[in-house]
Amino acid sequence: MADLSLADALTEPSPEIEEEIKRDFIATLEAEAFDDVVGETVGKTDYIPLLDVDEKTGSSESKKKPCSDTSQVEGTPSSQAAVLANGDHGIERNDVTGFPSEFLEEKMAYQGYQNSQNWPENTNFCFEPEHMVNPIQTDPFKMHHDDGLEDSLFFPSGTTNTSVFVEQNDPLKDTYGMLPCDTFAPAAVVPQGWSAEAPNLAHLESFTSPEAVPQPLQPTAEPAEKVEMASGEERAEALEMMMKLQAADMAPSREAEMVLAKDVVPATETGVALAKDMESPTKPDEALVKDVESSIESDMALVKDVVLPVQTEETAVKDAILPTETDVSLDEDLALSTETEVSTAQDILLFKETESIPPVTMDLASAEGTVPPTDQEMTPVKVAASLSEIEAPLDEDIVSSTEIRSAKEIGLSSETEVALSREMGLPPETEAILDKDMAAPPETEVIVPVKDMAPSPGIETTLAKDVAPRQEIEVTLGKDTVSLPATEMALGRNVALPPETEVTLAKDVAQPPETEVNLANNAALAKFSEAEVVPVPVKDMETAQTQEATSEDSQLKSLQDEGQSAVPLMTSPEAVVAMGQKHSLPTDEDSVLEELEQKKPSSQTSELPSETSGVAKPEEGPPTGSVSGNDITAPPNKELPPSPEKKTKPLATTQPAKTSTSKAKTQPTSLPKQTAPTTLGGSNKKPMSLASGSVPAAPPKRPAAATSRPSTLPSKDTKPKPVAEAKIPEKRVSPSKPASAPAVKPGSKSTQAVPKAPATATLASPGSTSRNLSTPLPKRPTAIKTEGKPAEIKKMATKSAPADLSRPKSTTTSSVKKSTTVPGTAPPAGAPSRARPTATPPRPSGTPPVDKKPTAAKPTSSAPRLGRVAANASAPDLKNVRSKVGSTENIKHQPGGGRAKVEKKTEAAAPARKPEPNAVTKAAGPIGNAQKPPTGKVQIQNKKVDISKVSSKCGSKANIKHKPGGGDVKIESQKLNFKEKAQAKVGSLDNVGHLPAGGAVKTEGGGSEAPPCPGPPAGEELAIPEAAPEAGAPASASGLSGHTTLAGGGDQREAQTLDSQIQETSKWLGLA
């Protein structure tokens, strides 16, 4: 399609592109409405043909239909078609966006395998990246995706794009082992240069990078071993799928190439596995579990790949060990519940993939990251113990709801990984934050890896634990979340939203399971991204907290996991929340604050929540629709219809569930999805839990509202994400900023944003759920605008600054500024939130949270504002510099004054005109001097002026010119006059004339001369010499002068006349 995109751009594809644009808008609308969710099965069937038939257009349709074709995710053909379409789109986008398209191309193309379900949002993402090729298409793309992607693609233009993608990959990496391939390739590439767009290219190359490729080989080998451990064929198949998907998602080129090369045959197997996944949700779950495990292994491999540069191998080895544990745990889990393990494996894998994030470990604290993972690993092991207990219930819950969600979640996880890879694209802010954190990312990544690594044991041990491990991850991230409190709170919103969002996303997953997982993973990713971003400052606390939080997390996980064994995943989210809260007690408080803040935003932000909730609810609503879509779209996830509903309720309930009332509900239902989101948002979700405390009733509303607009909201979910993200920044003020940085940016990252937005919306929507329901619809379309407006509106109250700042940042420098603000601001936010936590720890969803949130919002907004103001101040400085430049113009004007001086000098020179040369020289000299000093337009102008003046001065020049002409004329005149005068002087002229005329006179002089009168012949002869008067003179001397004169004419006659006169004189003399 690259050629086609070029050739077709000139020829047919233009209309196709227009169709794509139309389809993109339609797809956006459809994605919003997700009415196609019902037709997803058809979309499935048609999805592949759409991709295959209309690779570009079809891909756009198929991509838009992938929303409905969520099930297609598991369909390799459609995924491959999506890959073609993605590749086409990617190529197209490569044409337009260049790297981002390419990056997304690979990512999406590979994601297409898993992300057929992700396609719904990724429809926006994937075919919208294609749209990125088409700026018009970009608009719909921008609506959801553009925030992040545009920032990422457009804002970084490639740098942020890359960074965004790279760092989003990082979040994806965090979220996905798969993306970690992408992210890890970037991590390997990016950690080397996070902001590096080239690293993004490298990261694309990293996809293909030998480093990534050979490393994925080892990781693949390890995962293969692990796969063999878990189930050689299934995991190998799933691994191939995951490796392929991960390779596709994470290192589309890298492992995708390596793994795809390796998995190329497996790709067929992956297609088979995907087909199997399509065929049976349980198989997909197993395959996904395998995929997840393989993705974990792939993640491990990817982590190894990413971390390979630094610690990935160590961490990867640990991860490899963890994956081994995971395999053991997964084997146990598989024994317990393959699907449970699927969800756990998925979660684990997602987080293990997040663990793959150990690329961070690679960078910052490879040892540190590794060591905390050890603590966390110990904790995960502990958690594994409690989670193993929980796993039994989780097996039931997971098998029951989790199996359903497992498939969906796995689908989501795969897709989410894909979606996260996309959302990696989406997390421009996150990536921006990551860019900011790029310096920090090592810590963050390390922390994430630690988190991931530590969680990987726990996650691996318990997939229910996976939530708990994810909590650990979140704990690790939560430690990251220590700084992540903001990030995690933002992500927590994302995660908190993800429960809803994930529930919503579960619904959305129905639409775009990817979105769910994306949201969950995005939440995780956002969390990780933000965690990675924010964790940098947090990391210090994070390390201490990581260990504390690890034990706390382990305890919390165990307690929550055990306590919520029935609701393992939700418990994990709760545990995550508790862990997030606990491991970052500030985070807990942050979570509480977040919840309070979110609640406050709920009341306060109700307006925004109406927007946010509207957005979030749209997500929620879309999730319901999405659930249907998911159910329809994802055959494996079809079970999810109840789950989506459950998730919808649990989503709504998830917030309460986090409180622990709905946890049982939510966990089983939204467990898988929430597992990711909860894990991601565990700490972050806490706001949801707190919010859910106040929102318990509202979340149901949201489900209802969500249910009512399931189809519409999905797209909107994607779109609202920016709004939600903007709102999330609000809610999370400081975290919100990181969140908004990731979230707002996620315009492209809308998936991630959606989780945040849903969480935010969920948190905010408790009060404004009904409002949101009505508002969200408009907002989704306006999501981007809404992002500005809702965020502004909400933030106008308390966070007007943060929202504006977040939005401006996301809009302006969303990735850069936000990342800057997020790291700088997020820690302040984290600190304030931590400070707040003391007051906020009580979860009263009443005023205190609200108060807290305003406080948090205001401090955060102040800090962000300060940061942003600082950025703005520097911008004004530049402007001032420009004004100074304007003064430079004044300086130039001063040379103009010099012109006057030059004129004066010229005038002075003018008096000297008399010596015209001197006058000219003087004028030129002064002018030249005047001109030289001005150096610039003034000089030129002065020269012009001077020249004109000089001309006037020179006026003599005209005279000079005249002189040459006049001189010639004068010379001629003189010659004539001279001759005449001479003749007059001779006075004999008459005689001379007479002499030729009358020889009589001569006869008088001498008769002999009279005969010469007939001398004309001789005169003729002399006439030849006429030219020379001298010749005539000799002739005259000869005495023939008279004849010569007669023969001669004109001047010669005159000259000869003189000569003749002389001759005559001589004759007379001689006669005398």
Swiss-Prot record:
The keyword Acetylation applies. Is distributed ubiquitously among all tissues but amounts are lower in cerebellum and liver. It holds the Pfam family Tubulin-binding. The modification Phosphoserine is found at residues 5, 14, 60, 253, 280, 386, 414, 529, 572, 584, 591, 643, 660, 670, 734, 774, 800, 874, 887, 988, 1060, 1066. One of its GO terms (biological process) is neuron projection development. Tau/MAP repeats lie at residues 869-899, 938-968, 969-1000. Residues 54-67, 716-733, 786-795 have a biased composition (Basic and acidic residues). Interacts with SEPTIN2; this interaction impedes tubulin-binding. Interacts with TRAF3IP1. Interacts with KNSTRN. This is Microtubule-associated protein 4.
